[in-house]
A protein has these predicted regions:
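Structured alpha-helical subdomains that flank or immediately precede key functional sites
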Residues: 1-67, 71-89, 106-126, 266-268
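Acidic helix-start/capping segments at beta-turn-to-alpha-helix junctions
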Residues: 89-103
């Protein structure tokens, strides 16, 4: 058997990066609900960069040669959502959701499955899950118990570039979105953008950290990879409309409301 049963990409740092985003056999399994994203007209889009804000706490993760991109993008999206919503930063494990979703077999997972998981089970902090865990039987009861404090109360599927950009412009929360990693060189250009290639999304990333106008006049959203801070611009790059629309199969969701932890007295007050 091949050492890498998943498709993989050898990045610019020389590391093998399995591409662990898989699409559901019967199409998207993203849950549906009564919430929607208000569309922000392009004339009102604004540039910003959360990573330059004082106290920005997120650290780029590293899936370390496993197909755990979706688990890590999910954890990053929750960390970003909690910070945007004024909740204290807690580093969350990307291995916790991946171990549950892959069942101990490094076969990848889908974005829709991840949203259903964090709505039902939540996410465990990094302190509760040994790094590199993909066997769910090695997840402790304590990890599951603590994970209930880090659930997604409201998650919204995103189906268009306009919905994605609107969610980001409104600072709704972290967005887990698919992207296509090409077979060739996949490094950023002078604007921080990776090459666009056609095909189904095979990598999951967290976006929503910023927005900028490109030289072409188009727009791009800042995203955080999970290939360590050695990749890209200290682990970051920029996502464009072409990255989204050239995918033949794609998925995305935003964490609209991270659940408030009743044991945490630093939650922001509820405004009636």
């Amino acid at each position: 058997m091949s050492q890498y049963p998943l498709p993989f990409h050898k990045d610019s740092t020389g590391h093998i990066r399995p591409l662990g985003l898989v699409q559901p056999l019967m199409g998207s399994i993203l849950p549906t609900g009564d919430f929607a994203v208000p569309i922000v007209p392009e004339s009102q889009w604004q540039e910003f960069d959360l990573t330059t804000e004082p106290g920005y706490p997120l650290v780029v993760k590293d899936q370390n040669g496993k197909g755990a991109c979706n688990g890590h993008a999910t954890a990053e999206a929750m960390e970003l959502a909690r910070w945007i919503h004024g909740q204290p930063h807690v580093p969350l494990s990307g291995w916790f959701p991946y171990a549950i979703l892959c069942g101990g077999w490094d076969r990848g997972s889908s974005i829709g499955e991840a949203l259903a998981l964090i709505e039902k089970t939540g996410l465990a902090p990094e302190t509760q899950v040994p790094y590199g865990t993909i066997n769910p039987t090695r997840l402790s009861k304590d990890a599951y118990d603590v994970a209930t404090n880090f659930k997604c109360e409201v998650g919204i599927p995103l189906e268009s570039w306009e919905q994605i950009m609107s969610a980001v412009q409104l600072r709704m929360g972290g967005v887990n979105v698919s992207i296509r990693v090409s077979n060739g060189v996949w490094t950023i250009d002078d604007e921080g953008i990776v090459p666009v290639s056609r095909g189904q999304g095979n990598h999951a990333i967290c976006i929503g950290h910023g927005v900028k106008r490109l030289k072409s006049g188009g727009w791009a959203i800042k995203w955080q990879n999970s290939w360590s801070g050695q990749w890209g611009d200290k682990g970051y790059a920029w996502y464009t409309k072409d990255h989204w629309e050239t995918q033949t199969l794609r998925e995305a969701w935003v964490i609209r409301t991270p659940m408030e932890n009743p044991r945490d007295d630093s939650n922001p007050p509820v405004i009636s």
